[in-house]
Amino acid sequence: MAGPVLERELTKRTASRVRFDVAGEADDPEIRCLLRENPMAGRISVSLTREPNFFADHGVPGETKQTIVARENGRLVCVGGCTIRQRFVNGEPRRVGYLGGLRLDTRLGGRFDILRRGYEFFRELQTAAPAEFYFTSIASDNERARAFLERGLPGMPSYEFVGEFVALLIPTARRKGAKPRFGDLSEANLGKELVTSPNQHNASFQFAPCWSLDELAAFQQLGLNPADFTIVRAHGKVTAAGALWDQRSFKQTIIEDYAPWLRLLRPAINAFATVSGGPRLPAVGNTLANAYVSHLVIPIDETDELAELITELCVMAARRRVEFLTLGFASDDPRLTVLRRRFRAREYRSRLYVVRWPGIGGPAQDLDGRILAPEVALL
């Protein structure tokens, strides 16, 4: 009996030294430092950085971004955020929050008291204007985080598993384009149709973004321009579309290390990739030269058109010295099967959860049977 009591008292005293706040511009240098110095471990360890300004993508019309920081004895030790925007739920636009960017200083490994108090602080902030749903993703091989978050501990929100998600990194080299079927936005002069067509398409999926013209204009400051779109038109309407969104000007993935066996095999893997057109393993210290597929419009049953569209985006990416195209699908999405068959891609698996607190956030059981389709570029 004394053991649990002592543990609670030690946790209480330790946690009392931690202060939580909503982050502002003054916190920018320390947040970026925390992201740089605390890579995500795995077979390929990477740092997800936000240079030169963590807040560069804040202020997009229709989005509410809130970042929480934790300080222990004045030192920033943890950061996490939530982006609330319009996403489709059961065919209708709803206010949906995505919880992401959680990073705890590795020197404080095991300090789950900080995470518990951070989630409680976030819950208190959300009571004034909560989203209708919240969701998040956790890497499938991050067993430690999954074990903690799925346990339903006191003071923690409920994590309800809703599906597996697969992010693809498709190498762009050695592709032949499919023109003249494809054209870019400036040629087609789509205007509002570039918003209405993706929205009509996305209504068939869960958590897919609901776009607006205002945010599309704002994205030009973040590297998404009219020339980045490629489209297919039939009978005066858009039947397929996609955009190449290079976010490296404000969001980077840096290769920090490889598992020993993978480091040893890297030269052979890259030599084979050069011959086969498969994905190469970048050198340690390099920024991954990737861009995201955004504003994807493609019917599930149009398998040939999907492959042609992604091929055309690969050609566009290669011309810009982008080495990988990144996009993601739920594991039960037929489009994933098509791309696995047509492209040699590297896969990263994660698990999607609906997150909720008592009285805040909708439950997973309220979702109908539509396929999950959050856009990787917004996660």
Residue locations for each model-derived region?
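Active-site/acyl-donor-binding loops of N-acyltransferases
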Residues: A2-K12, I138-K179, A240-L379
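Long, hydrophobic/aromatic-enriched structural stretches that serve as scaffold segments
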Residues: V79-R85, V96-F112, R117
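Conserved acetyl-CoA-binding loop-helix of GNAT-fold acetyltransferases
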Residues: L104, G109-L125, E302-V315
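Short amphipathic alpha-helix that is part of the acyltransferase structural core
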Residues: A2-F55, P61-E63, T67-V69, Y98, ...
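A short helix-loop-beta-strand connector motif used in the catalytic cores of GNAT acetyltransferases and
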Residues: F54-E72, C78, A131, A218-I231, ...
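Non-catalytic interaction/regulatory modules that flank or connect domains
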Residues: Q200-S204, L213-Q247, K251, V315-V322
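Conserved beta-strand in the GNAT
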Residues: T67-V69, R75-R85, Y98, K237-R248
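Contiguous mid-protein beta-loop-alpha structural module that forms a pocket-lining wall or clamp
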Residues: L108, R116-T230
